[in-house]
Every structure is written in C-alpha cells, then in structure tokens.
Amino acid sequence: MATDVVFDTSMGSFTVELYNEHAPKTCRNFATLAQRGYYNNVIFHRIIPNFMVQTGDPTGTGRGGSSIYGEKFEDEIHPGLKHTGAGVLSMANSGPNTNGSQFFITLAPTPWLDGKHTIFGRVKSGMRVIQRMGLVKTNSEDRPVDEVKIIRAKVVEEGDE
C-alpha cells in the first residue's frame, strides 16, 4: 500500500510518494507530522537553485523542528537509493542520526549527499512547482525574499477510495 502526501503551497501543489519499505521509521514520522498539520503554514526557509528546496521547520529558522519520536532519530540509509536527479525527497540533518521534521527535495543530481541523508520518497506529480520554487529570488542566506510556504499537507493512502 503506497502512501502519498499532497502539499498545497503558495506556488501550487505537488505530491510525494513515500518509500515505506526502504525507510519505514522516516516515512511514519513524515506522514504522521503531515496528518497532524505540523507542516501547515511552514515556510521553505532555504532554496538553492540547481540544488534543493528545504522546509519542515515550524520556527522558519532552519534550526527547529522535532520528530514524532521525541527530538531526533536515526538515519535509514538504503544502499539502493541515491540522489540521482531532481525530485528526490530526503531528510535534512545536522550530521549522522539527527533527523527531525526538516526535509528537502532535490532540483538536480546531488551525489555528495548519498549515504549522508535518508531518502524516503520522490515527487510523484507537480515537479514543475518545485522547479519554479528553485528559481525564486533569495538573500545571501539562501532564504526566499518573498515567502514561499506550505499551506496544507494531506496524507493519501492509495486504495483508500
């Protein structure tokens, strides 16, 4: 059974498909946070063209956020999953085993992140929205000048019709 999360943002909607079998703990954390409304009204605090868009921190600083397991939880690095191109859904962290609520979506191949960040899904639809986000004007700290934010995140279980 596949789990999708639909994000309505200030720039349009996109859907991610979660890799429950490769990163079960990470996917459970992400889906539960989305279900609880944790990501609603959260900004994309870091956008780097041709690299990635990052969000998931309710403080909007890039230093906040926590998981459903408490503070931080361990990586689930799967050798078969690589940051091979645009649309990879991966956990942001501050070193090994420091996953919380922040995540990013790649805009290009980022092989230097392989083995360092937990890949737990991919963009299933709405990649154009992500690509447009990657083009917004940012300041010297990679923060969008005009706010880009998640309006609402909604979990959709396939086969729930």
From Swiss-Prot:
PROSITE patterns given in the database record: CSA_PPIASE_1 (PS00170), CSA_PPIASE_2 (PS50072)
Segments forming a coiled coil: none
Catalytic activity of the protein: [protein]-peptidylproline (omega=180) = [protein]-peptidylproline (omega=0)
EC code(s) of this entry: 5.2.1.8
One function term, GO molecular function aspect: peptidyl-prolyl cis-trans isomerase activity
Top-level enzyme category: isomerase
Keywords attached to this entry: Isomerase, Rotamase
GO biological process entries: mRNA splicing, via spliceosome; protein folding
Domain PPIase cyclophilin-type: 1-155
Pfam families to which the protein is assigned, alphabetical: Pro_isomerase
CC per GO annotation: catalytic step 2 spliceosome
Keyword Isomerase: yes
UniProt key word Isomerase: yes
Function description: PPIases accelerate the folding of proteins. It catalyzes the cis-trans isomerization of proline imidic peptide bonds in oligopeptides.
Family listed: Belongs to the cyclophilin-type PPIase family. PPIL1 subfamily.
PANTHER family: PEPTIDYL-PROLYL CIS-TRANS ISOMERASE-RELATED, PEPTIDYLPROLYL ISOMERASE DOMAIN AND WD REPEAT-CONTAINING PROTEIN 1
Full protein name: Peptidyl-prolyl cis-trans isomerase-like 1
